[in-house]
Amino acid sequence: MRTELNNNATLLLKDGNVAHVNNIIGSGGQGFVYSVTVDGEEYALKWYKQNPGNVFYENLQKNAEDGAPSSSFLWPKAVTKVRYGSFGYIMPLKPEGYYEFSQYRLAKVRFSSFRAILNAAIDLCEAFRLLHAKGLSFQDLNDGGFFIHPDTGHLLICDCDNVFPHGESSGVLGKARYIAPEIVLGKNMPNSYSDRFSMTVILFMLFCIDHPFEGMNVVRYPCMTEEIERRLFGEQLCFMYDDADTRNRPVRGIHSNAITMWNLLPDVLKDSFKQEFAKAKLDAPETRMTEMQWIDVFTGIRDSLVKCPLCGDESFFRRTGVVCINRNCRGTSTAEMWMETESRSIPLFNNNILRMGKSDAVTGRVALKPGGNNILLVQNLTTHDWRVITPSNKSVTVAPRGFFPVKEGMKVEITDNKSTITYTITK
């Protein structure tokens, strides 16, 4: 069977189009990746070294026909007809400005802000929420499976060919160290629950760079064998910050990223990781946090992320106020008013920018009323009218670019094209 394709080769696609091979741009364990041209547009083509079989082929074809669950997936667009004993599929090319996650881990690329990391985490969770809502599971999420823009945090997921319906197997168990313990131990095949474990591992690595289970326990074994790997990542899996088991703590000089970043994380995020990686949760896949629960955590943290009024560095605002994390500044500030829902708290202070959705789009800004008296105003920076209900139950419409003065007890209804969220002004 022929494994590599020649430049200028032509391949027939199942949708009737023709792919013209330009040149090879990468390779991996399963196959080769080529630049191809289809109907004047450039795509990436993954060509399998070994034919994965009819079941895989038919599933890939169905996924291509159904379309991507979200624009965050570099999803199969069309499958080739079988040629040279194998086949492949075309997908969108990675846009300029996006980098593999491994480059962030090696510090070759850095996020421009903590907000960008939060945006990447939300993008990942939202993509998997939509994937699972379609009854599909990814089955092979690992650190080599996506690209991220360092400034916006926008995330793109590749290697989508192992996506199968929940409960059905693609024949691929996943990459070692990212596989859920029940898969390592042979208790289950990959499914949406194991996806959630792999996703949480990636989330931890987004924030702490290091792997959540590679502490002292792994350092003890400079030569990893299959037996040791099964024990450390299956039978005796232990989170490096487990409250009850300290044997796998990060090692100074080796896990410097984890030690530094863990201390900077808000308590709600640290508690979420501890909860998800606790032994009781590891043994009960169906109890793992859903993607929406993670999104609520991250949007809440993003609401509290503010710029220090003195130096401009990012810091987390709490009810007790904020202390700048810049050691050369240590400026302090407080908020007298907040916009709140049951799950979100947004501090209101002069010059704060309000972002109130998963998309991180700017919704409004806070300003001081000219003339003194320290009266705070909120400006509507959306394209929709807001409805403000005063403490005396009077309804006021705030048009785009308009302002309203902040008073305790007010309710603010903010509507976009899909939903309305009601905030209450509190002290």
Residue locations for each model-derived region?
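ATP-binding glycine-rich phosphate-binding loop
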Residues: 2-40
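The N-lobe alphaC helix and its flanking beta3-alphaC-beta4 segment of protein kinase-like domains
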Residues: 48-72
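Conserved structural core of kinase catalytic domains
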Residues: 74-120
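Catalytic-loop of the protein kinase fold
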Residues: 128, 132-150
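Activation segment/activation loop of eukaryotic-type protein kinase catalytic domains
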Residues: 142-181
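Conserved catalytic-loop aspartate of Hanks-type protein kinases
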Residues: 195
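Conserved C-lobe activation region of Hanks-type protein kinase-like domains
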Residues: 203-270
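C-terminal boundary/linker segments immediately following FHA domains
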Residues: 389-427
